[in-house]
Amino acid sequence: DVKIVKKDKDNYEVVLNNRVLFEITTKYISTETKLGMFSYEKREITSIEPNLKRGLIFYNVTIPSTYKLYVNNKLVEEPTTKEKYKNLDNMYQNDSMPYMATYEINGLTKEESIKVVNEYDEEVKLKQNKYSYTLEKNYINVDSYDEAKKYLSSEVDIWDFAHKWSLFLTNDLSGLAHGYNTIKTYFIEGTSMSKQAYNWAHGIDINFTSRHKLKDPTFTNEKLNNFTIYSKDAFSCEIYLEKNMIVNGKDQLDVMHDYIYFIKDNGVWKVVNIKAGE
């Protein structure tokens, strides 16, 4: 349906199915009274600006780059723009992490069907705002590893990394260079995580960790949940564990509560970021 929508006292829009076709500018001439009761403004149109660069019917669809967009059951091949997910720059070391892709569909003569399929060949529900379509979430959330591994390209031993990282931070990890040669296999060379681990192992502070012993069992109260899956080859999870130590003859807990970010690199899971838990 075509509607005329007032923007402000001088400007109007001609709208078809939530799309602006024309912008109309007017100017005030006079106020007139009808039947001695009703007053109205008399206005003159000063300009009519068409807004038809994209045609009568058009859409914007924003989805992860690993998803497929179909318009009228035809696959749309290339997005108009691609942007990184916000606050996840460390995930972009290769092609494992998807981008947010926006498709501008222009020049249609009638409303067409819009369908989006994720990388697991499941149709996903879209949220419409005028002529723009987005997803409620641009990732999959599950609470357990058993659920998460259904969406991942292969299994990953998260606890193996978490235990070794915890030991590395208290100078308890076996291997050359205070365990650096052991832990570095989990990182992509040249990334911030790789540099952070190298600097810790080769700096002076690691030599001043408190003298302590590890209890048996070393790790207790372990929790692994809150998985966010960005693609088959990129995800994050929340981890909690308590490392049991004896310091100066007294029991002491070293708590690890972090979000760990993984991507696949050359077929191997790597850690690209660790953020402190809340």
Task: List the model feature ranges, each with a label.
Residues D1, T66, S144-T218:
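Core segments of small alpha/beta cavity-forming domains
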Residues L35-P50, V124-I158:
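Extracellular beta-sheet/turn segments enriched in Thr/Pro/Gly and aliphatic residues
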